């Protein structure tokens, strides 16, 4: 019995030792202003799990939380931002976010309903020279592993407007993708969180999320 236990422990140790360490983490942005930056608790963990399975990435299973004045900001290739309410960047935070994005980082802003009027003026602090532009359906972000010929999937109805994907392009590079009237992050949450969401809606949201991660990592 003891011999069998040792063999089992040795086998498990071998598996643990052979498993590669995660290559990187995805982060959720903790911003100021009082908005619920922490919304959608299961979104990123579910997206990470999906990406690791579907894209064969090696992302750490637990999301990070990062503030714009944190030294480790530059270590995350993909930062996700969500919420319903107020957003406020200090001048220093806006400079740090600009440095992150112009240095190769990628920000996904997800309108969780009500974010639009707050986030647009704050992103103007970051890139006063840029405007959000709606990306054409031919953009590569819609054509990574998964094809979305009609753009973003519509997860929640909100005001009944069509889902739109906006981008900030810095020197030709997409540095920020803004999913509006879509609620992509809600679609990533555990099935059953929103009873009206079907498994098909959940799957479509995860596939689009995987495209975002794939694009952020390859910029292709």
Briefly describe each language-model feature range.
Residues 25, 33-34, 42-43, 116-192, ...:
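An acidic, glycine-rich "communication" segment
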């Amino acid at each position: 019995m003891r011999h069998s236990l040792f063999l089992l422990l040795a086998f498990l140790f071998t598996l643990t030792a052979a498993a590669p360490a995660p290559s990187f983490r995805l982060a959720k942005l903790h911003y100021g202003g009082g908005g619920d930056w922490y919304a959608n608790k299961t979104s990123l963990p579910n997206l990470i799990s999906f990406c690791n399975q579907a894209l064969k990435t090696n992302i750490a299973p637990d999301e990070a939380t990062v503030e714009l004045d944190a030294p480790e900001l530059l270590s995350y290739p993909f930062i996700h931002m969500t919420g319903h309410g107020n957003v406020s960047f200090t001048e220093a935070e806006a400079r740090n976010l600009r440095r992150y994005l112009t240095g190769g980082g990628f920000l996904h802003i997800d309108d969780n309903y009500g974010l639009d009027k707050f986030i647009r003026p704050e992103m103007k602090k970051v890139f006063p020279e840029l405007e959000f532009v709606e990306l054409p359906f031919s953009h590569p972000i819609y054509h990574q592993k998964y094809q979305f010929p009609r753009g973003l999937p519509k997860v929640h109805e909100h005001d009944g407007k069509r889902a739109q994907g906006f981008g900030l392009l810095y020197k030709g590079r997409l540095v920020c993708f803004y999913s509006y009237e879509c609620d992509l992050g809600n679609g990533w949450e555990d099935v059953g969180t929103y009873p009206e969401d079907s498994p098909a809606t959940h799957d479509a949201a995860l596939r689009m999320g995987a495209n975002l991660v794939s694009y952020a990592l390859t910029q292709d």
